[in-house]
Amino acid sequence: MHGDTNATFAVGEIDNESRELIKVTEECIWRGIEAVKAGRPLSDIGRAIEDHAKLHKLGVVRAFVGHGIGEQFHSDIQVLHYYDARNSVVMRPGMTFTIEPMITLGTWQHKMWDDDWTAVTADGKRTAQFEHTVLVTETGVEVLTGGTGAVSGFSPFSK
């Protein structure tokens, strides 16, 4: 079985705008995780993330999405981090997928470097990203990559 997680960390001194971007991005992932409920569409996750980002006048990179995960590292489920009613797959107990919003100070559009790996926002503004692997349960959600230290003060699960 596979798991997938990542986080953004400040290295050295950073400006207040970058610090706020990291904080709001982490809040966004927990808003998305909180929206995981059996019987609800995946679009609820995107709505929760996008609404919180917009509240802080930030954008959501659209080209990179969460994915189904389990025996295969990437499976067919796509978890958008912005609202799109067409993302109507209904969450069912036993489903596992990642939630991994990339939040930006600027445009949601991106461009690829010549190395065919590195992606940057089209306007060159900074981004931050957090990711967890989650399991839909009968009563809500289990954060599978939420081991010791992974659940922060922004998490509704830390209270």
Residues covered by each model-derived region:
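Active-site neighborhoods and metal-handling regions in enzymes and metal-associated proteins
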Residues: 1-159
